[in-house]
Each structure stands twice: as C-alpha cells, then as structure tokens.
Amino acid sequence: GNGTVVYPEFGGIAGENALAGIIFGCTSKLNVNLTIAPMKSRVGGIAGLNIGTISKCVSTGTIRVTQTNGNEYPVYVGGIAGEIQKFGGMGGVLKECLHAGKITVTAANNRVGQMCGTAADNVLSSSYGLSGHVLNCYGKSGEGNLVGGTDASIGTGGLLTEAQMKDSKSYVGWEFGTDWKISEDGLPERVENPEITSLEVKNNWTSCYVGEKPWYWGRLLINGTTYSEITADMISGFDSSAEGTTHVYVEYKGK
C-alpha cells in the first residue's frame, strides 16, 4: 500500500526548526537518553533538524543515543542540531552557538558533531559553503569535530580547551559585556538585562504579499556596538491585510 514515512526528530528546544524559524538566545541543559528504532533519525541539543536559523544558543547537557539493528539507517546527532539543511537559497544557519556537553552514540551508521551531526549536500555545495552556514560557533576540545560526516572547513569558530572556554577572548565575534558574560560555572551565558543606552534599526524598507509576513525584519544596533537580528516576537503594529505602507514598532528587552 501507499504511506508516508516520518523520520523522528528530537531536540532540547524543538524537534524541527523550519525555514522561517529563528531559535534565538536559548540555553539547553537537558540530558537526553534515547533508544531509537531502526530508521533515519536526527537528534540535537537545540533542534533535531534545522532548516532555519539557530543563533546565540548554548547546549551543555549529555546526549546519549542508541540504535540497534539499524545498519541501513543513518543517525545524525549534534550538540546544537542533528542536521542542517537549506531550502532554496535560504536557511540552514548556526550562528554564535556553543556546545559544552558530551555526546555518546551507539549506532552502526552515525554522524556526530558538536554543532551538527551532518550538513546536507545543498549546504556543502552552496556558494557560501559550510563556512557560510556555521558561523562563530565553538565546541569542546576532545569531544569530536564541530560538523560530522565531512572534511569541509569552517572559517570561523573552533574547538576550545576547558581553560579557553572560561576566557571571553576565545570567542571571536561574540560581544561580551553587552550580550554575553562568563557565568559562575565558567561558561558563556546571555546577559539578560544589559544597560541599553541606544537602539537603532538598521534596515531599508521591506515588503511582503498581502496576508503574509516578511521573512526578514532587519537588525538592531544596540548601544552603537552590538547587532541583533529583529525577530517576529519583537514586532508590534504589523498589518498586512491590505495593500499599502505601514510602520511597525520594535521592542527589545523592554525598550
């Protein structure tokens, strides 16, 4: 007969982050212990499958995955995402993320990475390559590669020793003081309420069809030094029910 096969996707925050999805500023300390049936599977500390953007997220938990009798079926396991994919010319981005946990996989056909277990062919073969999709991301020395299943190079980020992880200077491209700080346990964490002295929207006008939303809202310049992507939850006053020009309001941390 006819049927649909749904591949399981597990994540500390979401099973799948779709093309328009942005997972921003999340920390997962979740310990995952999974026994998976023999079928293609994706497991990540933040998302099982990422087709959108995961930005400024930290995963510190332990991920244990076991698959028995699954020689023909791949298991993709990552500290942040099990797999990253593009759709058309967009998505599949991991930016400014850290994995500081441990990953253990028992499976005959597995791909494991501290950022993602695997990157889809359309990511590796894109004009930006892997370096354009995994940006300023860091993992722990001795715990495997950042991206599994490929020898493709990454231009930014890398693996850090325990001592380097506790040093803010190790995280090139991260804004400490306004956006990040080193926590009491020695790892980076987001600054919840930094003193905000100025906010500036950096974007030209954008457009969308009636009844839809723009896929990109622009960026905020915070205190004249730090950029942050504007996400849909920051927007108010948006109305696309009719043609015309509209102004929206952006709220960032109560400002």
Q: What kind of region is each of these model predictions?
A:
Residues 12, 45, 79, 203-207, ...:
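Short, recurring structural edge motifs at helix starts
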Residues 17-18, 209-214, 241:
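Short, low-complexity cationic-aromatic patches
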Residues 191-194, 221, 253-254:
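Secondary-structure transition/turn motif
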Residues 1-2, 199-201, 250-255:
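Short, intrinsically disordered, charge-balanced linker/junction segments flanking boundaries
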Residues 108, 150-153, 168, 206, ...:
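N-terminal start and proteolytic maturation junction detector
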Residues 205, 223-255:
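Serine/threonine-rich, repeat-prone extracellular segments and beta-strand-based repeat modules
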Residues 1-195:
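Predominantly extracellular beta-rich ligand-binding scaffolds that present long acidic/polar faces
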Residues 195-226:
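Solvent-exposed, low-complexity, repeat-rich "mucin-like" stalks and linkers
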